[in-house]
């Protein structure tokens, strides 16, 4: 019986030494070409929307929003746009969002967006609406990747999901 306990003891010790050796870290510096300090390429993703399928690079940082509904949705998602259409009843923003919109450039109204102002903001994403801006979609997508919701009426939750997807959230 003593020899059996001794053999179990030796096996346990051997196993612990073996596992410790396998788990040791190698402190050698990474190969230069193996992604050490080189920035990773941003990935592209696609968003299917009312007008097309749009490919977007990385996570957009400079967003222009072309609907009042969209402005409030972006703010709810924690995204402050660089440009937005004027609120219907605000000067230029609704009172309840005015504090969050400080520094945001007005880019026209929902029914009359200013393409030159939008282009000057150098957005990496434009979010609009087919019902309001279908006529300028081709021009907008030349400025930046552009995603349009189908309508302003109906299920706001669907538009919200589309905006979140366009923002890579």
Where are these regions (language model features)?
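A short, structured surface patch at a secondary-structure boundary
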Residues: 70-117
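Short, flexible loop segments at the rims of nucleotide/cofactor-binding pockets, characterized by
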Residues: 40-43, 59-60, 101-108, 124-126
